[in-house]
């Protein structure tokens, strides 16, 4: 069974800051608190429209984190150049639409193999580990392995949004099957999107899971309980699921 890690996404600390155009709350300070509470890494999504995390945030976080930085980004020339310059520990390549509220689905790796292969090589040559954010689909998983990505991150949005227990169980089985298949190809498996304190345990219990990236639920809980307690509680639930 893979060691299970928690990556805390702090995008919505920046969302709150940017809502009033202030210098607070500071994502860098939030990252420090999350690390102290047990986060194994910090995830930020530098979107093309800079709606929350900024270039400055990325630079400072890269210089100050004690754990690992995971930079989520679209597969564009601008973002690849920023990543190569900044050199985060990990880059997770994601699809991106300007009009979306949050990432709506996985990358179509199978439909753009050459583009993805070039991006993975460019990042790997800069010493960056690459993850591809994809749906729990065998064709996409095979394509991810073929283009040279060492990691995938399985999109858990459909599982999180399931309206019935039966639908959620079906989505969970699909994710578990995908994780097993990915591991059989030598890929390391992460997961994220829509995971909460109520639904995380079943995903955490999947033996192949290496890291869960969770943000909105933790920041939402932090408003009520404080960030340190919110991160610690999520980590406790994940590890409890592993027995």
UniProtKB/Swiss-Prot annotation:
| Record function comment | Catalyzes the complicated ring closure reaction between the two acyclic compounds 1-deoxy-D-xylulose-5-phosphate (DXP) and 3-amino-2-oxopropyl phosphate (1-amino-acetone-3-phosphate or AAP) to form pyridoxine 5'-phosphate (PNP) and inorganic phosphate.
* Effect the entry attributes to changing residue 194 to S: In pdxH null mutation suppressor
The record's annotation in Pfam families points to: PdxJ (PF03740)
Gene Ontology MF term list = identical protein binding; pyridoxine 5'-phosphate synthase activity
GO cellular component labels: cytosol
Q: Which GO terms describe its biological process?
A: pyridoxine biosynthetic process
Per the record, the gene is pdxJ
Q: Where does 3-amino-2-oxopropyl phosphate bind?
A: 9, 20, 194, 215-216
* Organism for this UniProt entry: Escherichia coli (strain K12)
Q: In which pathway does it act?
A: Cofactor biosynthesis; pyridoxine 5'-phosphate biosynthesis; pyridoxine 5'-phosphate from D-erythrose 4-phosphate: step 5/5
Q: How does it assemble?
A: Homooctamer; tetramer of dimers.
HAMAP family found in the cross-reference section: PdxJ (MF_00279)
Q: Where is this gene product found?
A: Cytoplasm
Main localization, broad class: cytoplasm
Identify the keywords attached in UniProt to this record, alphabetized.
Answer: Cytoplasm, Pyridoxine biosynthesis, Transferase
As recorded in UniProt, its EC number(s) are 2.6.99.2
The protein in question is named: Pyridoxine 5'-phosphate synthase
Task: List site positions: Transition state stabilizer.
Answer: 153
Q: What's its catalytic activity?
A: 3-amino-2-oxopropyl phosphate + 1-deoxy-D-xylulose 5-phosphate = pyridoxine 5'-phosphate + phosphate + 2 H2O + H(+)
Q: Where does 1-deoxy-D-xylulose 5-phosphate bind?
A: 11-12, 47, 52, 102
Positions annotated as active site in the UniProt record: 45 (proton acceptor), 72 (proton acceptor), 193 (proton donor)
* EC top class named in words: transferase
Q: Which InterPro entries match?
A: Aldolase_TIM (IPR013785), PyrdxlP_synth_PdxJ (IPR004569), Pyridoxine-5'_phos_synth (IPR036130)
The record's family statement is:
Belongs to the PNP synthase family.
């Amino acid at each position: 069974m893979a060691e299970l890690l928690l990556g805390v996404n702090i995008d919505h600390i920046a969302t709150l800051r940017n809502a009033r155009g202030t210098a607070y709350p500071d994502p860098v300070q939030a990252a420090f608190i999350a690390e102290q509470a047990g986060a194994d890494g910090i995830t930020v999504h530098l979107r093309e429209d800079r709606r929350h995390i900024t270039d400055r945030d990325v630079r400072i976080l890269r210089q100050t984190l004690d754990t690992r930085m995971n930079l989520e980004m679209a597969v564009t020339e601008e973002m690849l150049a920023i990543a190569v310059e900044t050199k985060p520990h990990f880059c997770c390549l994601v699809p991106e639409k300007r009009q979306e509220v949050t990432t709506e689905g996985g990358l179509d790796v199978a439909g753009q193999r050459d583009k993805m292969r070039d991006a993975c090589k460019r990042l790997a040559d800069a010493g960056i580990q690459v993850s591809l954010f994809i749906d729990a689909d065998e064709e996409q998983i095979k394509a991810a392995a073929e283009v040279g990505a060492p990691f995938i991150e399985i999109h858990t949005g459909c599982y999180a949004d399931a309206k019935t227990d039966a639908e959620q169980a079906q989505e969970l089985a699909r994710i578990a099957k995908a994780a097993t298949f990915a591991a059989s190809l030598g890929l390391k498996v992460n997961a994220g999107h829509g995971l909460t304190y109520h639904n995380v345990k079943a995903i955490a219990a999947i033996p192949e899971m290496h890291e869960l990236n969770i943000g909105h639920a933790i920041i939402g809980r932090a408003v009520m309980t404080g960030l340190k307690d919110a991160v610690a509680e999520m980590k406790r639930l994940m590890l409890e699921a592993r027995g």
